[in-house]
C-alpha cells in the first residue's frame, strides 16, 4: 500500500487509531469490547514472541487510501496511541487491531458518470460503446470519482491466547474474519489457523436445550431465538424478547426446524447469541463485571483487557464443553463429558472421519 494522498495531514490523519475499546461516553470501555467472536485454533508448529509479532506487523501498518485507491487495510495500535505498539500483552493475552478503509462510491453515481462518458464516446465516434467498452468506461469512472469519495473505516479486534493456542476475531461475518485471518497469516509467516469445531453440532445441542428446557451447566437460556427449516424454502421463525420455554417452540423443533441462533447467559455475567456455525455474537458484559476496576486513564486499558478476556476465556471453555468438547480435525473424537446435553442418536455419528469438515457435517464412510 502506497502512502496516503489527499487526506488531512498531521495528527488528524492519525485519528484512525481508534482505541481497542472504542465506546460511547455512557459506557465503560471494556463493556463494549468484543461484540462478536469467531474462534480458531492455531497450528501446532507456529510460535513467536510479542516482540517478533510487533516487528512483523510493523511492515504492514495501516496507511490510509491514496487518491485513486479504493481500499486499504493494515495494523494499528490496539491501545489507540498514535505510535504505540501493535501488540499489547496483558495477563497472558495478546491483543491486536486491523484497520480496514473502504472508499464509498454509490452505484447510481458510478452509472451516471459512465453514462456521461458513454455519451462523449458516442458524440465523438458516432456509435454507442459496446459491453466491453462500457466496462472500461466504468473503470475510468471509478478512477475519476475515487478522489472525491467518502472513506469508511472499520477496526477489527484480534485476540491471541498463546497458552491455549486459540485465536479469536471480533467480526460479525465470516468474510470479514477471513480477511483479517489472511492479513494476519501474510504478516506472520508460518502462522496457520483453523476454525474451532466441536464434537456435537451446535444446532443439535441448542435444539436439545430448548426441547428439554435444561440449559448446560453454567448457562441460562435467554429470550431470543431463531428456528429455520432445512428444506428448500427455509421458512424461519424468530422470537425476540419472548419466553422460549413454551410448547410452540418445542413443536417447531419436533416438526423439523433447527435452531440457528439462541441467546444465552453465562454465570449471570456475560450474555451472547450462539449460532449454528459456532459464532458468538452480540456479547454483552453484565452489571458488576467491571465493578472495582481502575478508572485511571493509564491503568484502564490493562484493567479492562484483563477483566474482559478473563471472563470470556472460561466462558468459551464452558461453551465448548457444553458442545461435547473441541474436536481437532484429523483426531478421533473424545468421549462426550457426562454433563454434555443429551441428543438424538442421529445427530452425532459414533465416529468422526478425518476430513476438513466439522464432525457434525462429515459424511460417514
Question: Language-model features: where?
Answer:
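Intrinsically disordered, low-complexity, charge-rich terminal extensions
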Residues: 31-365
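Short, Lys/Arg-enriched N-terminal segments with co-localized hydrophobic residues
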Residues: 12-32
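Intrinsically disordered, low-complexity regulatory regions of eukaryotic regulatory proteins
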Residues: 10-12, 354
Amino acid at each position: 500500500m502506497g502512502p496516503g494522498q489527499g487526506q488531512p495531514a498531521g495528527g488528524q490523519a492519525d485519528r484512525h487509531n481508534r482505541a481497542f475499546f472504542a465506546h460511547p461516553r455512557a459506557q465503560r470501555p471494556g463493556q463494549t469490547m468484543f461484540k462478536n467472536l469467531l474462534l480458531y485454533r492455531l497450528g501446532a508448529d507456529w510460535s513467536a514472541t510479542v516482540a517478533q509479532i510487533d516487528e512483523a506487523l510493523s511492515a504492514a501498518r495501516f496507511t490510509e487510501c491514496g487518491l485513486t485507491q479504493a481500499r486499504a487495510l493494515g495494523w494499528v495500535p490496539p491501545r489507540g496511541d498514535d505510535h504505540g505498539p501493535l501488540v499489547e500483552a496483558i495477563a497472558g493475552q495478546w491483543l491486536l487491531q486491523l484497520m480496514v478503509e473502504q472508499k464509498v462510491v454509490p452505484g447510481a453515481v458510478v452509472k451516471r458518470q459512465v453514462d456521461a462518458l458513454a455519451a462523449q464516446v458516442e458524440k465523438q465516434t458516432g456509435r454507442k460503446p459496446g459491453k466491453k467498452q462500457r466496462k472500461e468506461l466504468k473503470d475510468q469512472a471509478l478512477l475519476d470519482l475515487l478522489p472525491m469519495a467518502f472513506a469508511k473505516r472499520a477496526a477489527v479486534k484480534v485476540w491471541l491466547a498463546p497458552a491455549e493456542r486459540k485465536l479469536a476475531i471480533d467480526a460479525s461475518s465470516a468474510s470479514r474474519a477471513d480477511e483479517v485471518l489472511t492479513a494476519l497469516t501474510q504478516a506472520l509467516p508460518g502462522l496457520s489457523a483453523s476454525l474451532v469445531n466441536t464434537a456435537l453440532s451446535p444446532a443439535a445441542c441448542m435444539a436439545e436445550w430448548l426441547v428439554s428446557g435444561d440449559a448446560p451447566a453454567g448457562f441460562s437460556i435467554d429470550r431470543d431465538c431463531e428456528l429455520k427449516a432445512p428444506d428448500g424454502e427455509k421458512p424461519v421463525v424468530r422470537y425476540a424478547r419472548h419466553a422460549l420455554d413454551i410448547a410452540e417452540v418445542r413443536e417447531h423443533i419436533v416438526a423439523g426446524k433447527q435452531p440457528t441462533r439462541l441467546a444465552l447467559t453465562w454465570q449471570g455475567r456475560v450474555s451472547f447469541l450462539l449460532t449454528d456455525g459456532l459464532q458468538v455474537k452480540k456479547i454483552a458484559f453484565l452489571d458488576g463485571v467491571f465493578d472495582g476496576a481502575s478508572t485511571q486513564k493509564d491503568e484502564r486499558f490493562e484493567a479492562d483487557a484483563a477483566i474482559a478476556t478473563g471472563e470470556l476465556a472460561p466462558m468459551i471453555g464452558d461453551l465448548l464443553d457444553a458442545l461435547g468438547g473441541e474436536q481437532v480435525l484429523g483426531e478421533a473424537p473424545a468421549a462426550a463429558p457426562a454433563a454434555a446435553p443429551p441428543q438424538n442418536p442421529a445427530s452425532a455419528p459414533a465416529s468422526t472421519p478425518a476430513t476438513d469438515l466439522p464432525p457434525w457435517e462429515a459424511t460417514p464412510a
